[in-house]
């Protein structure tokens, strides 16, 4: 039994470090215990306080599996942060795809791309394919290196140095 307890607290310590919980003694840890009524369970406080506002509360079920108990407010904030992070990641991927195709006016290409994304019903969009499509439909928004005229035998570097 002592070995099991040490194993439990090692797992809690590892999770606490990952969650940047400074004071592990303040961490509320509960244990779910069986009850004579099969429709009920008992919660036993193993560590911390019932009045603790620090989240998450850690709960061990009867099989020793560790669960986290959060308030709806905290869960809602987490979901909102995940949504914002996903949105930011998508915007960065779109920005990278646009810049790889040498836009003359980044914001014009961005606006066209956002309109295309709004029209599309796809949840997983291929931004490179989207920008290629925009480039074929609106070539005036992009720099085409073929349009740059250099005399035969000249290079971009030697032209700039002159």
Swiss-Prot record:
Entry protein name: UPF0763 protein Sdel_0383
InterPro entries in alphabetical order: UPF0763
Top-level taxon in the UniProt lineage: Bacteria
Pfam families: DUF2603 (PF10788)
Similarity field: Belongs to the UPF0763 family.
């Amino acid at each position: 039994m002592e070995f099991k307890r040490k194993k439990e607290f090692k797992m809690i310590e590892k999770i606490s470090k990952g969650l940047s919980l400074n004071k592990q003694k303040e961490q509320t840890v509960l244990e779910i215990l069986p009850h004579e009524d099969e429709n009920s369970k008992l919660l036993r406080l193993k560590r911390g306080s019932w009045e603790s506002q620090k989240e998450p509360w850690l709960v061990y079920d009867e099989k020793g599996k560790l669960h986290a108990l959060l308030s709806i407010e905290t869960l809602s904030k987490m979901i909102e942060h995940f949504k914002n992070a996903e949105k930011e990641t998508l915007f960065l991927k779109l920005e990278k795809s646009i810049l790889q195709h040498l836009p003359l006016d980044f914001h014009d290409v961005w606006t066209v791309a956002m309109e295309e994304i709004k029209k599309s019903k796809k949840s997983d969009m291929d931004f490179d394919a989207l920008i290629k499509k925009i480039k074929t439909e609106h070539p005036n928004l992009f720099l085409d290196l073929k349009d740059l005229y250099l005399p035969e035998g000249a290079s971009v570097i030697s032209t700039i140095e002159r």
